[in-house]
Regions:
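Hydrophobic alpha-helical membrane segments of integral membrane proteins
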Residues: 147-148, 160-163, 168, 175, ...
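Predominantly cytoplasmic-facing regulatory/coupling regions of multi-pass membrane proteins
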Residues: 2-125, 174, 183-285, 307-317, ...
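Transmembrane helix boundary and interhelical junction motifs in multipass membrane proteins
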Residues: 98-103, 135-145, 253, 271, ...
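Hydrophobic alpha-helical transmembrane segments of multi-pass membrane transport proteins
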Residues: 117-151, 284-287
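Membrane-interface alpha-helices at helix entry/exit sites of multi-pass transporters
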Residues: 118-122, 137, 141, 151-167, ...
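Mid-bilayer segments of alpha-helical transmembrane spans in multi-pass integral membrane proteins
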Residues: 128-137, 167-179
Length: 357
């Protein structure tokens, strides 16, 4: 009995130590949770600041664009364009933006992410409509995608990868359309570009050669890009071919919007105009101006200098309105509703507490 009494304090000491360790573990766990909460709160604040900055910047750009529009010129452009022209332009705009959703769809497939198409379409449409107008697509488009995709478990690194893969889709489409137009309609393009026929054909052949080299690379090699610890596995041949088709379809639809708005009697074939449009887009992208504004228009005007300048300017103004400004305003409204709804739901969930279930 005495032995038991002597052992009892030892057992109590051991039990007390175990309890202390358990309390310490709970305390540390609580500290970790608190630190995680603090990190989430900081990220939420940063996200709110970025959201506010992007929305404010968007409305500033929108205000400036609207301020530069001459209402008389806009009215003249609308009067000179027929209802049929405007209707076809609207349809082609919708087709182009619908194909743009394929950019994100292919990228998500490559990254192994399964996201509902309605979410993909929303993220794609809003990100492109915003970045087309504001410029700097890696920043503006990436930010919008982060807003939409992050609640569905897609991390920032994968969103960056998605943006790069979508960019590859765009450039594959641009390259094949330009190369085809330069080779197939070299004579007409040479007249517009004021270059020699041989140079035009050679440029088109070089474009096809570059595309062939890319496809050989993705077929025979395991295409992986490593940049300072960031690793991206590029799509293989089958998915790359789908990328090229989607990109080409988008470029053709977008070019069609401007083509149908041009004044009648220009005698320019759509296939020839594709080369003019793609080169204008490339120069606009190189200028880093939002939507390539100014550079794009100047390139089109120089290439189509045989057409009435007023008519081409009117077509360009309508093109900016239908393809850029209207989708931009729609995207802003959609994002505003989306962000407001998400923040209201989050506030309601916090107010309800963990016992609401």
């Amino acid at each position: 009995m005495a032995d038991l009494d002597q052992a009892s304090p030892t057992r109590r000491t051991a039990e007390t130590a175990a309890a202390d360790r358990k309390d310490l573990a709970v305390s540390v766990s609580g500290d970790r949770e608190t630190a995680a909460d603090r990190r989430r709160r900081r990220l939420s604040i940063i996200g709110t600041v970025f959201s506010a900055a992007l929305f404010l910047g968007s409305f500033v750009v929108l205000w400036r664009i609207l301020g530069k529009i001459d209402l008389d010129e806009l009215s003249t452009a609308f009067r000179s364009a027929s209802l049929r022209q405007i209707t076809i332009a609207i349809i082609l705009t919708a087709v182009s933006y619908a194909l743009l959703t394929g950019y994100d769809y292919v990228a998500l497939k490559q990254l192994g992410e399964r996201i509902a198409y309605r979410i993909t379409a929303f993220a794609s449409f809003t990100s492109y409509a915003i970045s087309f107008t504001l410029g700097f697509p890696l920043v503006t488009g990436g930010t919008v995608r982060y807003w939409v995709y992050s609640p569905h478990g897609i991390k920032a690194a994968k969103i960056a990868s998605l943006t790069v893969i979508a960019g590859i889709t765009f450039w594959l489409g641009m390259s094949v359309v330009l190369s085809w137009s330069l080779v197939r309609h070299a004579a007409e393009v040479s007249v517009l570009a004021k270059t020699g026929l041989s140079l035009t054909q050679l440029t088109g052949v070089a474009g096809f050669a570059a595309l062939a080299a890319y496809f050989i690379w993705v077929i025979w090699k395991h295409p992986v890009v490593n940049v300072r610890g960031w690793r991206l596995e590029l799509p293989r041949a089958r998915l790359s071919f789908i990328q090229m088709l989607i990109g080409a379809g988008d470029v053709c639809a977008a070019a069609g919007v401007l083509f149908v708005l041009l004044p009648g009697g220009h005698g320019l074939s759509y296939e020839t105009f594709l080369a003019v449009y793609v080169v204008a887009c490339m120069l606009g992208i190189a200028s880093h101006a939002p939507g390539g504004i100014g550079v794009f228009e100047a390139t089109i005007l120089i290439a189509l200098d045989r057409l009435p300048t007023g008519g081409v300017l009117g077509a360009l103004l309508l093109f900016r309105l239908l393809y850029y400004l209207v989708p931009f305003v729609i995207a802003l409204a959609m994002l505003f509703v989306h962000e407001t709804r998400r923040r209201v739901n989050r506030a309601n969930a916090r107010a309800a507490g963990p016992d609401s279930k």
